UniProtKB/Swiss-Prot annotation:
The lineage of its organism: Bacteria, Pseudomonadati, Pseudomonadota, Betaproteobacteria, Rhodocyclales. It is found in: Cytoplasm. GO terms for cellular component: cytoplasm. Its main location: cytoplasm. Keywords: Chaperone, Cytoplasm, Nickel, Nickel insertion. InterPro entries: UreE (IPR012406), UreE_C_dom (IPR007864), UreE_N (IPR004029), UreE_N_sf (IPR036118). This is Urease accessory protein UreE. HAMAP family: UreE. SUPFAM superfamilies: Urease metallochaperone UreE, C-terminal domain (SSF69737), Urease metallochaperone UreE, N-terminal domain (SSF69287). Involved in urease metallocenter assembly. Binds nickel. Probably functions as a nickel donor during metallocenter assembly. GO terms for biological process: protein folding; protein-containing complex assembly; urea metabolic process. It comes from Azoarcus sp. (strain BH72). GO terms for molecular function: nickel cation binding; unfolded protein binding.
Length: 159
């Protein structure tokens, strides 16, 4: 089994891919299969959240790219920004992982939350797409200098 214990920060292209949904990308210890079919064991620092496009360094020198797998999501749209902010508030109040976009929110599919959002007047559409939610104010994710993931107001914790 291929072992991965660190991130790759160089310029070499990845030689394989590791496709994982968001739930698996939050696990620091994981056994999975690469696109090539090779088994891989992840032993990353606790609290790591993998993002699509990140590169990992295997013990044997191989570079593996993380791919955010498509999953069942709900896209939330509202008639105006205040209603969208209200929907985001209620999701945040329930500690729901939320991906933010221009005029929309995305969450993992959940019929209870879907009902709540419809009750708030939101338009809720099911879709299948990669899920890249906000890290949260207290997250301790891994970032790369120069990749556009530098500290921002919504990434205040321990960067």
């Amino acid at each position: 089994m291929l072992l991965i214990e660190s991130f790759y920060e160089g310029v070499r292209a990845a030689t394989d891919q590791l496709e994982l949904d968001f739930g698996y990308r939050t696990k620091s210890r994981l056994r999975a299969k690469l696109a090539s079919g090779d088994e891989v064991g992840l032993f990353l620092p606790r609290g790591t959240i993998l993002r699509g496009g990140q590169k990992l360094q295997a013990r044997d020198g191989r570079v593996v790219e993380v791919v955010a797998a498509p999953e069942d999501l709900l896209e939330v749209r509202c008639a105006d920004p205040l209603e969208l902010a209200r929907a985001a508030y209620h999701l945040g109040n329930r500690h729901v992982a939320v991906e933010l976009g221009d005029g929309w929110l995305r969450i993992q599919a959940d019929h209870v939350l879907e009902g709540m959002l419809i009750g708030l007047g939101a338009e809720v559409l099911p879709l299948r797409a990669p899920f890249e939610p906000e890290a949260g104010a207290y997250a301790h994710g891994h970032q790369h200098p120069g990749d556009g993931s530098g500290a921002r107001i919504h990434m205040m914790g321990g960067q």
